[in-house]
């Protein structure tokens, strides 16, 4: 259900600012009389939202004169694109304060004419009109690989200092073969082979970069082929 909710967010954000929502206090949750506005603090480095847009949206939600249900307000703010969690508090003086935790992009996917991020938790997030994150790119067919598999691959790359600096993009071609595009020492591509077993081959690639390329033994090549067990075939 969590994944379905996140997928729903991917498309809902584009119209969020144009839909007024009446927040009633008919269910459980703390109530607060609407004040002059809401203070917003954005948490996390990725600016999917800015304070002004979140404040305007919150003010729109609170524009009625009824008491505000802060729990419902939190749920509504959490539906904004790129928002992982929202918490709303009373400031003790009749106003409200909101903390907004934003997603951190891990990889940008290109599927046919669609492009979006997967975040570091493995959930899809729509692109932001405010900015573009510098993350590795993945081009594949729609539904070619589950998000969980893609998340595991790119999280492994991100957490490795050598690989994360070297790899710019990945292409998943026919037969689920992985082609990597890298720029360590020189621009080149890496034929990683089929999806199964990618971790061992990436560890082999990291060793080659660290012990051969960074040591200056081989710095000019067009392609590295890791499809053969225990080998790195260098092609000019």
Residue ranges of model-derived segments:
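Charged, solvent-exposed interaction patches on well-folded alpha/beta domains
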Residues: 1-42, 46-236
